[in-house]
Amino acid sequence: MPLRPRRPFDAAEAAAQNDRLLRATITEVHVPRAGRPDLGAHPLCVGCPVYRTGLVGNVVDDVAQSFPMMMAAHLGGEGVTTAVDPTDEEIAALADRAAGCTGIVIGSYNGHLHPQQLGLAKALAAVGKPIAAVALRNPYDLFSLPENVYTLVAYEYTARSTAAVADVLRGHSAAPGRLPIAHPDFANKEAQ
């Protein structure tokens, strides 16, 4: 005899529960001494497009759905989609461009495997603007960033996670998640 649900599936209720679970996983990893940054009215949002990290996936090559473009739409800034491994020239040009913005948001996607992404984050941190870095997959990307960088981990590269991160960056919601790993170098850096 087949099992029958006690009540019909409610797609809206399931979507709301999914959103609550996603928002509960957004994790604040590092808060600079100056606190959560005020990114201002025109932040520069940068990062690479989503790409397939394994042999399975339905990745659509759509720059409009890239983290920087989606984040810029949420925050009212400008979005620039970089290469997965930005060149030194691209990094220098973005650092120059960031000087004219009110703040910076950078999304990393496996930056621990693509060190040029972390080089970009460090170059942008040196500009001196309020800055936030968001790991869109693994939190390892965040451990080597300078002290002045506010860091969050979203664990996924989706429109929903980008909206949740934007709410945290605007101060509309908290980042209650917990980091599931400990990194000795990061712990030592935090103790200093």
Placement of each model-derived feature along the sequence:
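Preference for extracellular/luminal or secreted protein segments
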Residues: 1-192
